[in-house]
């Protein structure tokens, strides 16, 4: 096997030279963002003989390994005597001398790598290195150190780094060799392909090999997890730099991907895979700040991590939550940082959307570097539209401000008091003379920018130097403000900034109307992406809103692999569940439900348009000899799992689950066989008319697209299709669905019906429902 390795300077020196503790008082998202800004400011102040963000790359052969080392130097200065100097800029909230002394080997190592690359490019015998330190919040405070090296000194230094890195990386080379051998021998893990499965697999293989974006509607039963992962893995053979990101919004999606890989491993595949778990779920020290004074797992993290990675990769290939926490606990290291570092040496990374698409929490280690080898599988892609909008939107709450101010009312910190006073004045100025309601701001106010910036700088200083002043309420508010401030950089024609004025409060809301261009930008960074779901109709709408190109990106809509007659769709158009009519429908809908469940003992879901409607329905429905379980607001994951345990196979009594359409039980639920035999869907799933959706509709209207469809109709019908999809989960399942609303007979809604719904039957009374289903279940 030819051994090749592409490394960024950051990857090399961070792995080998970083030491000490995790400390979010010094290294955090806010300080990184401010650091980027100060980098740009400082670079712009230099003269014409200063080159900023200079790209460097060189190929080396070390111990039989072909290594490409690359990166961007912060600056290159040509001095008057013709000599060159590499400028490495570091900014920090910490005192400069302490920061420099704690991190010198790491910083000078990075600069020396850039210096060597530039010396090779320009054929220089010697070169200078400058370390420029700038204090955040006190930009005039700088520390500049100059060093000079011969090319031979730099060569010895960099080659020594290579040798140290390869001593560790030989584990990975051995793994890659085994992985490639087993991928070559790997065959599809099932005896035969299901209907549509081979077609989906071929498309995915082509995307993984050739690049591009692909959109696929793959209904339940096709086996879309295996049909996407298997060809991606097959296509990645002999490309040691490819990482496959399996992105999903739900725990069930992670479990499906994990189980698919385990099945392939059982057939001989050797592959490193990891499931990334959210920080709040994996943390050992909940409530602690991420610094060595509060969390023992932060202390000495960077001194330990090389050894822990070496042990982990020698002994494991599957890294799930249990394995990660076990290793981290044993070695007393932070499990969250550990799983992120470990992912660098894994082939498949199973994680939430935000690790790729969120502008604040995306994995910079992958997407701030060259990502052109990587592949993405976006599961349940219909969810990414709203999720991405949320990622690029933010809110500052006046109530959160009041809570923060109250929590530090006894503080004597002068600058904090001043920052809070400025915020109070800002809220007063913005809302002066405004009635309750939503008020759009035409421009982003200068005062808003300056006051938020002052507050952030103040909190950064407190967080580092007077941490005892940072109450939970102040920290929570600071994080909200910091997120809002960062996202303000995106403010433009795809945004509105508005005030939501309430009777006793106000929210400042930065709303992203359309995040498709941001999704597209991320997808352009990587080699290939497949975005798939059981519900991607109308397909043009999803390609539009998920950053695709309707004219050029391939798409496919696969038919259901299940017998069409196994699902009975009934439409009850005599009932109007529109907002103005709802109060008159509870008893009538209750009668439809009673007759729907009358013929067959079993498990049924009843989907209501809202919690309020569900409560009134339960008050008005008269049910006997049935067990009833009701979804509650804000159910935790373990509560949802317990809820579903009430719907077991071979029930002796009828069990009803009352829930809200579009909620946790509308998708990602897999109740096979007779664990679920029917669903009643009340209404069309459309969100209630609201200010933000109206603005989204207006945005698309202004671009000559059907705004109401984009903001209301399509998302609503998607929730309905997802809910219907809970009923038939295998080839042997039989079940029925009752759609209650007059609008289901309207053409604009019927145009969105799936192909297997086209044989739906209209029922004009509860008795007709009972009669129809008696024949269906009898047959």
Kindly label every feature range from the protein language model.
Residues 1-79:
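Metal-dependent nuclease catalytic cores that hydrolyze phosphodiester bonds in DNA/RNA
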Residues 58-156:
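Mg2+/Mn2+-dependent nuclease catalytic core
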Residues 175-217, 230:
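Conserved pre-motif I regulatory segment
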Residues 181, 187, 241-349, 357, ...:
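A substrate-engagement module of RecA-like helicase motors
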Residues 228, 255, 331-348, 353-456, ...:
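Signature of the SF2 helicase/ATPase Hel1-core->accessory helical subdomain module
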Residues 324-349, 360-367, 461-576, 584-585, ...:
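A contiguous, basic/glycine-rich beta-loop/short-helix subdomain that forms a polymer-engagement track
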Residues 521, 573-609:
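Conserved interdomain hinge at the start of the Helicase C-terminal
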Residues 573-584, 632-745:
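Conserved RecA-like P-loop NTPase helicase motor core
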């Amino acid at each position: 096997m030819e051994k090749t390795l592409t490394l960024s300077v950051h990857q090399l020196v961070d792995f080998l030279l970083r030491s000490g503790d995790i400390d979010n008082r010094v290294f955090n998202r806010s300080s990184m963002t401010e650091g980027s800004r100060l980098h740009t400011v400082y670079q712009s102040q230099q003269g014409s003989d200063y080159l900023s963000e200079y790209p460097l790359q060189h190929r080396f052969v070390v111990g039989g390994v072909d290594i490409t080392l690359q990166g961007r130097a912060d600056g290159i200065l040509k001095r008057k005597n013709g000599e060159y100097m590499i400028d490495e800029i570091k900014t920090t909230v910490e005192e400069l001398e302490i920061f420099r002394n704690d991190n010198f080997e790491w910083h000078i190592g990075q600069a020396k790598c850039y210096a060597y690359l530039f010396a090779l490019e320009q054929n220089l015998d010697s070169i200078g290195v400058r370390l420029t330190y700038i204090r955040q919040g006190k930009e005039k405070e700088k520390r500049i150190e100059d060093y000079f090296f011969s090319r031979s000194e730099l060569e010895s230094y960099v080659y020594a780094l290579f040798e140290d890195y390869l001593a560790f990386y030989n584990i990975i080379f051995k793994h890659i060799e085994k992985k490639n051998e087993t991928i070559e021998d790997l065959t599809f893990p099932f005896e035969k392909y299901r209907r549509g499965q081979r077609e989906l697999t071929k498309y995915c293989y082509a995307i993984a090999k050739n690049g591009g974006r692909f959109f696929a509607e793959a209904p339940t039963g096709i086996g879309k997890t295996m049909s996407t992962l298997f060809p991606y893995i097959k296509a990645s053979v002999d490309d040691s730099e490819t990482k496959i990101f399996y992105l999903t919004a739900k725990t069930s999606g992670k479990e499906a991907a994990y189980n698919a890989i385990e099945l392939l491993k059982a057939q001989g595949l050797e592959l490193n895979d990891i499931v990334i778990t959210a920080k709040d779920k994996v943390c050992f020290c909940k409530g602690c700040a991420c610094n060595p004074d509060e969390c023992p797992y932060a202390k000495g993290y960077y001194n330990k991590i090389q050894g822990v990675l070496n042990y982990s990769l020698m002994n494991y290939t599957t890294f799930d939550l249990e394995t990660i926490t076990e290793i981290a606990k044993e070695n007393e290291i932070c499990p969250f940082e550990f799983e992120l570092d470990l992912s660098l040496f894994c082939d498949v990374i199973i994680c939430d959307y935000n690790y790729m698409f969120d502008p604040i929490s995306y994995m910079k280690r992958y997407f701030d570097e060259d990502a052109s080898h990587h592949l993405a599988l976006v599961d349940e892609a219909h969810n990414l539209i709203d999720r991405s909008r949320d990622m690029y939107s933010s809110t500052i709450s006046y109530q959160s401000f009041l809570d923060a101010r109250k929590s530090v009312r006894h503080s004597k910190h002068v600058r904090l008091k001043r920052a809070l006073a400025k915020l109070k004045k800002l809220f007063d100025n913005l809302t002066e003379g405004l009635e309750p309601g939503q008020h759009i701001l035409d421009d982003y106010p200068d005062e808003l920018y300056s006051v938020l910036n002052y507050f952030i700088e103040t909190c950064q200083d407190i967080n580092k130097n007077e941490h005892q002043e940072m109450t939970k309420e102040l920290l929570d508010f600071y994080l909200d403000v910091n997120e809002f401030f960062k996202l303000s950089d995106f403010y433009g024609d795809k945004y509105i900034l508005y005030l939501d004025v309430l009777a006793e409060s106000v929210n400042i809301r930065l709303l992203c109307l359309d995040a498709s261009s941001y999704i597209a930008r991320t997808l352009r960074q990587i080699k290939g992406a497949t975005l798939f779901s059981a519900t991607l109709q109308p397909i043009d709408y999803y390609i539009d809103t998920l950053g695709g190109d309707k004219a050029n990106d391939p798409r496919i809509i696969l038919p259901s692999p299940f017998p069409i007659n196994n699902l009975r769709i009934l439409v009850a158009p005599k009932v109007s569940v529109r907002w103005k009519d709802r109060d008159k429908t509870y008893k009538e809908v209750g009668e439809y439900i009673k007759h729907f469940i009358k013929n067959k003992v079993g498990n049924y879901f009843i989907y209501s348009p809202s919690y309020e409607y569900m409560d009134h329905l339960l008050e008005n429905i008269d049910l006997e000899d049935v067990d009833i379980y009701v979804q509650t607001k804000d159910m935790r994951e373990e509560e949802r799992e317990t809820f579903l345990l009430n719907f077991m196979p071979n029930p002796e009594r009828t069990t009803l689950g009352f829930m809200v359409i579009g909620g946790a039980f509308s998708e990602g639920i897999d109740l096979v066989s007779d664990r679920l035999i029917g669903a009643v869907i009340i209404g069309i799933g459309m969100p209630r008319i609201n200010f933000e959706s109206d603005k989204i509709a207006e945005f698309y209207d202004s671009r000559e697209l059907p705004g109401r469809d984009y903001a209301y109709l399509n998302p609503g019908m998607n929730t309905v299709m997802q809910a219907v999809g809970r009923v038939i989960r295998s080839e042997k399942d039989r079940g029925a669905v009752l759609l209650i609303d007059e609008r289901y007979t309207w053409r604009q809604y019927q145009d969105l019906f799936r192909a297997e719904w086209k044989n739906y039957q209209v029922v004009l009374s509860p008795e007709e429902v009972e009669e129809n289903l008696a024949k269906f279940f009898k047959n």
